[in-house]
Amino acid sequence: KSTMWFKRLFGAEISAQTVSNIVKELDHQVQHYHRRWLGDDYRFLYLDGLWITVTRPVKVKKVLLVALGVKQDGSKELLSFQLADSESESWWWGFISDLKQRGLAGEKLEALVSDGASGLVKAHRALYPRVSHQPCTFHKANDISAHLANKRHRHRIIADALYVFEATTATQVRKRLRLFCGKWWSKEPKAVRNFVRGFEHCLTYLEYPDPIRTMLKTNNPVERYLQELRRRIIPMRSFNNPKSAERIIYGLIAYVINQPQDVPNYEFTQLA
């Protein structure tokens, strides 16, 4: 079974003994990864979650909490991950607290980017109270879907909402917001009301020039990793247990980071 999942994940066949050796090395690497000192040289912090299935002792859904940091020099690093029961405030509190205990005090941290989930936002405000929050504008626009009276409006109204955030100044954004409200209020008042609620909190990205502005306004930097993890996890359907899940996820992260892209690795080359 181990050789089968390795082939599914990485597209290569290896012996059972090699898999056993890799598993032992991964256990060591996972421990080191979760205990390593992070330091406090991060300018931006991205937080997100990915839901997966664990089958033992019973079949349950777990969420993989992930943190990506952007340093002062612009380099990116996957800081941590954790399997959690939910995205509640208490789980996010524990996850972020661990980052702080390992050196990420937040003295240089300017903004935290997330999908705007209430539990995460509450934990962020408590643990990094002086750090600005930038809700992902893509999630903000797509949240409209849940409040539509007519689902046939979905693509057009979301496109219009995303267009609002393409403006490069606060004045332009607010002008586009007024036009958006004028166009859609009579057709979709509930959706418009939801979009306007908390809108001003979504404009932190406008305080920065490009390309930082583009990078900050969505969760894309960390979503790229989650999409690749999701693509490789799907063939497995589920994990046998939390320890197996953590080991495999770490191995996948190591593999993904070592693929050609614009994100430097931590020290995953030790797995080679």
Name each model-derived stretch.
Residues 1-6, 176-177:
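Short, charged amphipathic recognition helices of the HTH superfamily
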Residues 3, 20-23, 158, 226, ...:
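Hydrophobic face of alpha-helices
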Residues 5, 9-113, 118, 122, ...:
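RNase H-like nuclease fold core
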Residues 12, 16, 106, 134, ...:
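Alpha-helix N-cap/helix-initiation sites
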Residues 110-118, 123-160:
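Conserved beta-strand -> loop -> alpha-helix junction used to position metal-binding or nucleic-acid-contacting
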Residues 162-272:
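Acidic/histidine-rich catalytic cores and adjacent linkers
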